[in-house]
Regions:
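N-terminal low-complexity, intrinsically disordered segments
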Residues: 1-76
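Sequence-level detector for tyrosine residue identity
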Residues: 14-15, 39, 80, 84, ...
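Generic structural signal for hydrophobic core residues of well-folded globular domains
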Residues: 51-54, 84, 88-89, 144-145
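Short, Lys/Arg-enriched charge-dense amphipathic segments
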Residues: 62-64, 84-94, 120-128
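Aromatic- and glycine-enriched beta-alpha-beta binding-site module
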Residues: 68-109
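A recognition module on extended beta-rich or small alphabeta surfaces enriched in W/G with H and D/E
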Residues: 105-184
């Protein structure tokens, strides 16, 4: 049986955090050992420097996706960014692949619509942070690999969005207020 998206992501995150050598290859593993994947602001600074170093070497996303070890690197780093958001905002995280996310969106639509997820690489990994915020961290990688320092701004904007969406409106029905608090 194929592991779920969450199992695959959590496996990658486990090896990043514990610094244990995984039974599969992750590109630039030696360099990743120098990053403290401890959900601190320092970890984001180290991650930004890692991406800046890759940009100086002109390493682009298609090159990384050309082999499995590069794919593991890309997914692991994107997953850490989304997991960082969830952990630092105190929210639960759920992971979806393209098919699962498409089905989730179809269930949430109250009215039949033609809107769908684009069929592209960036939609292949989506994190639901809390109950309402969806994050596609793979979309951030091209800018990071071009040397753009967009990670702090992305984290700040997404953190604000997560906090706004997790607030409980006390003017709602008592059941909705209770559900809002229990969901946290």
């Amino acid at each position: 049986m194929k592991p779920t998206t969450a199992q695959q992501v959590n496996t990658l995150l486990y090896y990043l955090q514990t610094k244990q050598t995984p039974p599969f290859k992750i590109l630039f593993w030696e360099n990743l050992q120098k990053i403290d994947f401890d959900y601190s602001a320092n970890s984001l600074q180290q991650l930004s420097r890692f991406f800046a170093a890759m940009a100086k070497r002109h390493i682009q996303l298609p090159q990384l996706l050309a082999n499995q070890s590069g794919q593991a690197l890309v997914v692991a780093l994107a997953a850490y960014i989304a997991d960082y958001l969830a952990k630092t905002t105190g929210q639960a995280i759920a992971w979806y692949d393209y098919d699962t996310m498409s089905a989730q969106l179809a269930r949430q639509n109250k009215y039949p619509t033609q809107s769908q997820l684009p069929v592209d690489f960036y939609a292949s990994l989506t994190a639901r942070i809390g109950h309402k915020v969806y994050c596609q961290p793979l979309k951030l990688l091209p800018d990071l690999l071009q040397g753009k320092d967009v990670l702090p701004q992305f984290i700040a904007q997404m953190t604000q969005t997560v906090y706004q969406q997790s607030q409980v409106n006390l003017l709602q029905s008592p059941e909705a207020v209770c559900q809002g608090y229990l969901a946290k």
